[in-house]
């Protein structure tokens, strides 16, 4: 019998074969599948968005992958977070006598995972915890109030653990600012590399492995851009370490296991990392986080910066030394500080980083401040006042978030990051000397390119509480059957994050002679998170996006493909329905140069 014939889905208390899923998918379950000799994956699944974090923004669900090696010794990798605790532990008990569990191996440690660990370790008091030294220090704090006394064994680079039957595990520390205790593990018996946060994707489905791996390209790129791009230097160092291990399968914490597209995904990571490290401008993003909220904000701001073509050097002040902070400030065109407020103050590592920055930063560097708080937020005010008194200019209004961030908060942070990056790029352009050379071939080409004309349109989108819009003229019909069109969207546009595959939008076509008001409205700058539709007459389309009632016509569209083209995404969308609202002709945008809109 083949591996896939043994695939199971467990939703307590019933066992259901995932080969024949129910018509209505359960909100959460645990899928079990043997993946190699002595090795099984437990995929805790949800089809809903798990958290309000930018990395879950595609809203395609996720899996929290745990792995069990049952050799002479038994080891469990990466129990899931609090959202899956009951389902996972209940399912594990059905498959394993927890008194026989020898090791719990942790790729990383955070407060979310600690909830599951407390229950699991109370049921398996004999199990030894395997983790890195930073993870062990964090774990001792997180488990301080729990009645568990499991031994902790710290693993360093190239340390080994023999489970028997050829499963002699090797451990590879791969720290990053957000996950300073990250630990990858290689099993030579199965040639599986357990990669924790590397090579994952937030997507939920029945497929355990990545057959037809190209369908996951967008999910994996988005995951990389949100989670790993701000730590490009550390991720690049991690990949260099992992090259020494001849893996045939990547076993990540989230999404399908990587087997069929392993080489291509590895090459993609190397390319994406090279692109980040080659950016001309860099922002130092320095933060500390007490409960994870400030780091969530930092991740959203970083996403906004990197999508605008500026690199980010993320610095976790709690785990970085003075030289690292000084070097990051020295290489950056701007810096952003994020802090929680603890007892009315900023954490000591943030105060230390502040002193280093004030002593070494140039007043030409742009700055920004953000943070989360429970009651008063004094740390955020302190940082803002210190930088303002020192004469620094701010790239966005200070962001203050009470308790946990929401979808709207994260969108505001992303847009603030984009504004920050755009301000840096404009300043850099002003500093560049103007050429005194005669008209170049490229200038003549730009003039010719500018003679291409396009219909003036407004693209509008709505997802839950989030909405956005942009003026567009790079629009063209692409197909007759099905009726389809293409629209080019700059990577740094705020609406870009709402226009991924299967997303819906409305293309509002403007009318000649009645377009200037809408054109001026959507050309004006909006504050991060600002309402694009204030004082604009709209109706709601069947796909949920706004229709501008003053437009000539509209088309309800659904994104089918995204093609990365330089500094733009070219979207191919099918039109589900549309209507002519007025008699008239389409407004057309005429340009003189192809180097701007």
From Swiss-Prot:
One of its GO terms (molecular function) is FMN binding. Keywords: Electron transport, Oxidoreductase, Transport. Its EC number is 1.-.-.-. Residues 449-597 are annotated as: Flavodoxin-reductase-like. Disulfide bonds: none annotated. Mediates electron transfer from NADH to oxygen, reducing it to water. This modular protein has 3 redox cofactors, in other organisms the same activity requires 2 or 3 proteins. It is an enzyme of class 1 (oxidoreductase). It comes from Synechocystis sp. (strain ATCC 27184 / PCC 6803 / Kazusa). Its cofactor is Fe cation. Binds 2 iron ions per subunit. It comes from the Bacteria. This is Putative diflavin flavoprotein A 3. Residues 59-254 are annotated as: Zinc metallo-hydrolase. CDD domains: flavodiiron_proteins_MBL-fold. In the N-terminal section; belongs to the zinc metallo-hydrolase group 3 family. Residues 283-421 form the Flavodoxin-like domain. Gene3D superfamilies: 3.40.50.360, Electron Transport, Fmn-binding Protein, Chain A, Ribonuclease Z/Hydroxyacylglutathione hydrolase-like. PROSITE patterns: FLAVODOXIN (PS00201), FLAVODOXIN_LIKE (PS50902). SUPFAM superfamilies: Flavoproteins, FMN-binding split barrel, Metallo-hydrolase/oxidoreductase. By homology with NorV in E.coli, may be involved in nitric oxide detoxification.
